[in-house]
């Protein structure tokens, strides 16, 4: 099925068009000696007209019958193309961007394509418990590969060293997998899920 691109989508977000909307589905999590648990997750990738995607994920543990048991965790962040920032871009702080986007056409965006044929991206994700991750990677067609470039932990936060995340669109389902290195262990499987889009991308500003 062709990927639908919202008519009001800023050119810089076209590589992310296949992610936009709300997704829901089930998966499994575990790590080290922790018991493997089934979960349900709702993930939203939202565009507002600015050159970044707002990411939110809500995870609920399931019981042995597959029914919701209790909330597990939330995370949220921002996905964007990794490129040098210019005077017309947002920030620093609350300083707004220029009304006209820095990248105004598909041709401008195409110039950012890397040697592998994809686009370099940065993804910042904040987790409860005082952990913030900065991922670098690429988006190439309906696939995203990410690896942590930096992890910030608040004093008293649990030990978390690094992570990798993989996202892909397979038969119109969003598949993702997360490996992490934590608690002094090497990078290993942590969680994965298969999600179905339940709401299409909303128009910017809605």
Show which residues each predicted segment covers.
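Soluble ligand-binding/transfer domains with enclosed cavities or grooves
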Residues: 2-7, 13-201, 205-206
């Amino acid at each position: 099925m062709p990927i639908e691109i919202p008519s009001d989508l800023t050119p810089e977000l076209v590589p992310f068009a296949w992610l936009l909307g709300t997704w829901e589905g089930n998966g499994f999590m575990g790590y080290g000696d922790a018991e493997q648990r089934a979960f349900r997750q709702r993930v939203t990738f939202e565009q507002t007209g600015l050159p970044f995607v707002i990411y939110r994920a809500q995870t609920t543990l399931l019981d042995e019958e597959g029914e919701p048991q209790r909330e597990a965790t939330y995370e949220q962040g921002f996905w964007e193309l990794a490129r040098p920032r210019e005077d017309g871009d947002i920030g620093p702080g609350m300083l707004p961007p220029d009304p006209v986007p820095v990248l105004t056409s598909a041709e401008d965006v195409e110039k950012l394509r890397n040697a592998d044929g994809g686009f370099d991206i940065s993804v910042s994700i904040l987790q409860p418990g005082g952990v913030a991750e900065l991922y670098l990677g690429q988006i190439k067609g309906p696939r995203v590969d990410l690896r942590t470039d930096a992890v910030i932990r608040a004093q008293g936060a649990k030990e978390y060293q690094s992570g990798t995340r993989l996202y892909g669109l397979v038969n119109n389902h969003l598949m993702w997998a997360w490996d992490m290195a934590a608690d002094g262990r090497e990078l290993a499987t942590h969680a994965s899920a298969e999600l179905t889009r339940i709401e299409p991308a909303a128009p910017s500003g809605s």
